[in-house]
């Protein structure tokens, strides 16, 4: 890509002759090389899942989290550069707190997604900034019910029934499309997300990984929370069993 973009990839404010912004494309590459992130909208809430690649055997379990709470009713999962993701989380928390202070009510998921997307896009407009090397899947529960958005490094934001980022995004999207999300509960969704992440993990190329899961549903009192340890373990067992069954076939 560098040979094609020579002279046009030095600044995010420079377009190539064919209308491309190479700095944004490079940022997207950072997302594509990350562990897989999946988000689905079930009939009673949202489930977020992350394939958090373990870079060292010395790393403590649970460190370097990829799923973060933004407000009591919303959370986001990060694919790409973790440090860039933390900056977006910080901004999202600030926007949520500011909105509630001014208007006296929790920020809607759509408004939060729009504000975060505008902030991400801002970093593609000025030469002294660089695009964020991460993408996020934002989920929440507001007066309109469960909502799911994906924000890309370019600042583009779309609403989804199911979304995926990272290395296994294409395979994950294919599996998500097979699910009847309108009939799926979050308890069932946890297992399905675990199966997808275990299924797209490439043991030959990738390191070991840690499964992160969170949900926002009636069972969690419509608050963004980590999936309880017992349900997480059940999901892992079901996913591993499905993977072994697939290998046996």
Curated annotation (Swiss-Prot):
Disulphides: none
Gene Ontology terms: cellular component: cytoplasm; nucleus; proteasome core complex, alpha-subunit complex
Keyword entries, A-Z: Cytoplasm, Nucleus, Proteasome
InterPro entries with a match to the protein in the record: Ntn_hydrolases_N, Proteasome_alpha, Proteasome_alpha-type, Proteasome_asu_N, Proteasome_sua/b
GO BP field: proteasome-mediated ubiquitin-dependent protein catabolic process
Bilayer-spanning residue ranges: none
Gene3D superfamilies assigned to the protein according to its UniProt record, in alphabetical order: Glutamine Phosphoribosylpyrophosphate, subunit 1, domain 1
Localization in the cell: Cytoplasm; Nucleus
Pfam families: Proteasome, Proteasome_A_N
Quaternary structure and partners: The 26S proteasome consists of a 20S proteasome core and two 19S regulatory subunits. The 20S proteasome core is composed of 28 subunits that are arranged in four stacked rings, resulting in a barrel-shaped structure. The two end rings are each formed by seven alpha subunits, and the two central rings are each formed by seven beta subunits. The catalytic chamber with the active sites is on the inside of the barrel.
Role of this protein: The proteasome is a multicatalytic proteinase complex which is characterized by its ability to cleave peptides with Arg, Phe, Tyr, Leu, and Glu adjacent to the leaving group at neutral or slightly basic pH. The proteasome has an ATP-dependent proteolytic activity.
Family per similarity comment: Belongs to the peptidase T1A family.
Name of the molecule in the record: Proteasome subunit alpha type-3
Gene transcribed to yield this protein: PAG1
């Amino acid at each position: 890509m560098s040979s094609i973009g020579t002279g046009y990839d030095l600044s995010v404010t420079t377009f190539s002759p064919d209308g491309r912004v190479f700095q944004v494309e490079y940022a997207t590459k950072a997302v594509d090389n990350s562990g897989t992130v999946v988000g689905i909208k079930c009939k009673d809430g949202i489930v977020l899942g992350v394939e958090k690649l373990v870079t060292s055997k010395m790393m403590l379990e649970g460190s370097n989290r990829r799923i973060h709470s933004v407000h009591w009713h919303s959370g986001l999962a990060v694919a790409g550069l973790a440090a860039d993701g933390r900056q977006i989380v910080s901004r999202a928390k600030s926007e949520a707190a500011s909105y509630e202070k001014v208007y006296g009510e929790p920020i809607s998921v759509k408004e939060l997604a729009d504000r975060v997307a505008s902030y991400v896009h801002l970093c593609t407009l000025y030469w002294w900034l660089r695009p964020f090397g991460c993408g996020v899947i934002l989920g929440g529960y507001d007066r309109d019910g469960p909502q799911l958005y994906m924000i890309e490094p370019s600042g583009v934001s779309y609403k989804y029934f199911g979304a995926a980022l990272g290395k296994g995004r294409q395979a994950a999207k294919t599996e998500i499309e097979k699910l009847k999300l309108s009939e799926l509960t979050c308890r069932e969704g946890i297992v399905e997300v675990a199966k997808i992440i275990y299924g797209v993990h490439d043991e030959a190329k990738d390191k070991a990984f840690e499964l992160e899961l969170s949900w926002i549903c009636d069972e969690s009192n419509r608050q963004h929370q980590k999936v309880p340890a017992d349900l997480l373990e059940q999901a892992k067992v079901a996913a591993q069993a499905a993977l072994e069954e697939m290998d046996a076939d």
